[in-house]
Each structure stands twice: as structure tokens, then as C-alpha cells.
């Protein structure tokens, strides 16, 4: 009964207005009030401040500064082998597996369209047909910077406006086409094993989505799809990111979806729905190397 009420509220609440209000408040320097909110949040969600570069709450002037706090050097070692992909974020696996007949598993009993996720771009969707996907959910307590699973050259970025439903497990299990209807930023990289998509999905009270090369992508929320293209590898202005390098962040947190082309990666066998992820640990092995787990 309670879960049903929570889902109905997702449809009824003014999500855009709540998100704007949360973003405004999270950027305010509220002195003692900001400190009170940060400490209450950390206590409620059991945030491990020992991992933070600066573990003192007083170091953070705004809630957003606290929320996107960097980690201490060395607490997230990145898997070194060239053929191994690293997990892009701290969180938990929502779902992972094969993209079948253009459909991606959202939750038990719920699929959504690959093409819809990619804003109706059928040419882009064709690059990932019959490929692999992994969805990583970042809970409020998690580290909220997103990193590269592998070396890659940025090909294009697409901002897709949309709803701002919560992306927690309850909502994922009950709101159809959740990730294809929410606001998102699609980043396409060319890698040594083919194309890779890294998609940052917005949600209720996610005040902004940022990337390291373009800064804040949203807000503003103008309600139109925006697309940027970038030079190829070796050309002037090409944007190359290394495995483990930060590529974006959420204020506040949300979900990351990775897409891979057909036959290009083997996910680590210990990963399944609900598995805890830590940025830098093994996500998958890239072909043509034979899996060696």
C-alpha cells in the first residue's frame, strides 16, 4: 500500500518545481543551516566521510560542495590491465545483460526501447543492437562523480529533455520506460573495442548534470534536444579521456547507463542485479581478448 502511494505521488508531484527548488537550496551558502543539513544527511544515509579528500563537514560551504566531494587519492584504485574495463561509479547494479531485439531490461517485467533511450536516433541505436548494457544506480550516500570505464575519444554529446521521476529501485520496478522518459545526457565515445555510450540520467531533485569538458549541461531546461559533435582522434580539439578519469557528476545523484556494441565485452561474472559497485573495480573484459576470469 505504501509503495503504491509513493508511485502515485511520483506522477502527481510538481517534479520540475521541486528540482529547481532543491538545486537553488543546494547551491546556497547557508552557514550554520547548511552545516546542519549536511550533518543530518550524512548521519541519515551513513555517508563514509573517511574516504573524502576533506572529511570535515565545515570544509563544505554549500550542500552541493559536500555532495560532489572528491575522494582521497588511492581509495578507488583503477584496474590497470588494458583489456579490463573499470566500473564508472560507486553504487549498485540495477540491471545488466544483453540488448535483445532493441529492448533493454529496466526491471523484472519492464523493458524499454534502445532507440527511445537514444532520443529516437536509429542510426546510433544500430551501433548497439544486440550489444550489452549495464545500469548503475547511485544512492544518496554514494560518491557522485562518474568516471571513464576505459580510454575513449568523445564523439558526440546529446542532451535529451524529459521527466524527472525518481530512479530508485521502487520507481524502476513500477514506472514504465523510466530511463527513456527521464532527462538525460548521452555521451558517445570511440574506444579500442568500438563505440561506448555513457548516459547520465536525471531524476527528481537532481539539480544539475555536468561534464568535465562542457561544464553544466542542465539547467537550463529548455525542453529541446541539443547535440554537440567533437573532432576525431588525432584532430585538433579532440577530447580524449583516460580510464578512471572523471567525466561527469550529478548534483544530486542518479543513474548511469553504459552501452556496448555486440560481442565487444564480457561482464565480470560476480556482477548481477543488486551487486555493489566501486569506481575503478572490474566491470568487464573487452574482446578480442579471451575472458580470463
UniProtKB/Swiss-Prot annotation:
It is found in: Cell membrane. Its cofactor is pyruvate. GO terms for cellular component: plasma membrane. Binds 1 pyruvoyl group covalently per subunit. It holds the Pfam family PS_Dcarbxylase. It is a peripheral membrane protein. Pathway: Phospholipid metabolism; phosphatidylethanolamine biosynthesis; phosphatidylethanolamine from CDP-diacylglycerol: step 2/2. It comes from the Bacteria. Is synthesized initially as an inactive proenzyme. Formation of the active enzyme involves a self-maturation process in which the active site pyruvoyl group is generated from an internal serine residue via an autocatalytic post-translational modification. Two non-identical subunits are generated from the proenzyme in this reaction, and the pyruvate is formed at the N-terminus of the alpha chain, which is derived from the carboxyl end of the proenzyme. Its EC number is 4.1.1.65. It catalyses: a 1,2-diacyl-sn-glycero-3-phospho-L-serine + H(+) = a 1,2-diacyl-sn-glycero-3-phosphoethanolamine + CO2. The active site is at residues 90, 147, 254. Its main location: membrane. GO terms for molecular function: phosphatidylserine decarboxylase activity. Keywords: Cell membrane, Decarboxylase, Lipid biosynthesis, Lipid metabolism, Lyase, Membrane, Phospholipid biosynthesis, Phospholipid metabolism, Pyruvate, Zymogen. HAMAP family: PS_decarb_PSD_B_type1. Belongs to the phosphatidylserine decarboxylase family. PSD-B subfamily. Prokaryotic type I sub-subfamily. NCBIfam families: PS_decarb. Heterodimer of a large membrane-associated beta subunit and a small pyruvoyl-containing alpha subunit. This is Phosphatidylserine decarboxylase proenzyme. The gene is psd.
